[in-house]
Amino acid sequence: MSALQWSPHPASLAERLADLAVDALIDEADLSPKPALVDRRGSGAHTDLHLGLMHSSALSLWPTFKWMADAATQFGVVGQPLREALGRLGREGEATMLRTTSGVNTHRGAIWALGLLVTAAALDAQECAPEAICARAGALARIKDRQVLTQNSHGDQVVRRYGVMGAREQAQQGFPAVRLFALPQLQRSRAAGSGEQNARLDALLAIMTTLDDTCVLHRAGIEGLNAMQQGAQRVLYAGGSVSLAGRRALNALDQHLLALNASPGGAADLLAACLFIDGLEPALGPVSRSA
């Protein structure tokens, strides 16, 4: 699908990138069956989320992603002015999201990850290979936003308590969970003949095998994190989501995480990032740089 309504005029680069970011969020939400996450079956481990809300939230972020891409074109280089413009746009996008969802945090982490990647792509649409995109996004993430004086989200608290790498550090290192695990697994599963939905599920599981998911740690502690990582490994070792043994292991993982009230929201955000990067080169083609 495409988030942008049909227009008789060719879409600009910023519009195409915003389309792709929103599509990645919707495709991630729709993917089923995801362990303990919102999907087409239901709300997973959540009581305040459902699929329609995830769709509405994703669509509300289209202007935010477009404006981030526009900012990249305006400033042209990685630096403090662009970083602080992104921070401001991200906070405005978060406010829009919260208005849309009546205060429910659906996509805060995704605004951060996809916002950086959208901006990185807009800085050089001719060089959209995963390593290049993630390197530019990482360089942006490493610049401090001087407008933010304190960091005290649930994720920040978990990082301090457990000494793990959170969403900020994942971005600053150029999204290793996406580059080194999700994208290679996506390609391996496709090459092995898996359908697209199974390949994407396997990519999510590959992220879950190693990610210190702060959403899981916040809700279920180390026990939940171990259950997520080890359970995801069992699914992939059993042949992935396309195999009967893998499906049984995936169902067991789903039930275990639900019992622990552990929802791997950080992994879901990174799957959306993976889908965005995976779709870049085929989606862009010839583009107009006009806003």
From Swiss-Prot:
Function: Involved in the formation of 2-(5''-phosphoribosyl)-3'-dephosphocoenzyme-A, the prosthetic group of the acyl-carrier protein of the malonate decarboxylase.
NCBIfam families, A to Z: malonate_mdcB, PRK01237.1
Catalysed transformations (reactions): 3'-dephospho-CoA + ATP = 2'-(5''-triphospho-alpha-D-ribosyl)-3'-dephospho-CoA + adenine
GO terms of biological process kind: prosthetic group biosynthetic process
Matching Pfam families: CitG
GO molecular function terms noted in the UniProt entry: ATP binding; triphosphoribosyl-dephospho-CoA synthase activity
Coiled coil: none
EC number: 2.4.2.52
Name of the protein: Probable 2-(5''-triphosphoribosyl)-3'-dephosphocoenzyme-A synthase
Family: Belongs to the CitG/MdcB family.
Keyword Mitochondrion: no
Keywords: ATP-binding, Nucleotide-binding, Transferase
HAMAP family: MdcB
